[in-house]
């Protein structure tokens, strides 16, 4: 879940006018760190997968896939404007 939240709110590649990467290392690439995460409330909905043994589904990918879209959708509803890009930085939200 932390990875999905980090993808949604801060991770991005930035390039200069020559096309060179301005965020080439972890010092300049903005990852979420321990203590910067919100408290999560998690609920699971069981929907078996018909095409797999015992109806199992992948577990670890759900937070990565759903959280950026869910956060963008919630902020879009709150601001009353369509959000079509990530990351959802404070600067980007201010410009809405």
Q: In which residue ranges do the predicted regions lie?
A:
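C-terminal catalytic domains of large/alpha subunits in multi-subunit enzymes
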Residues: 1-96
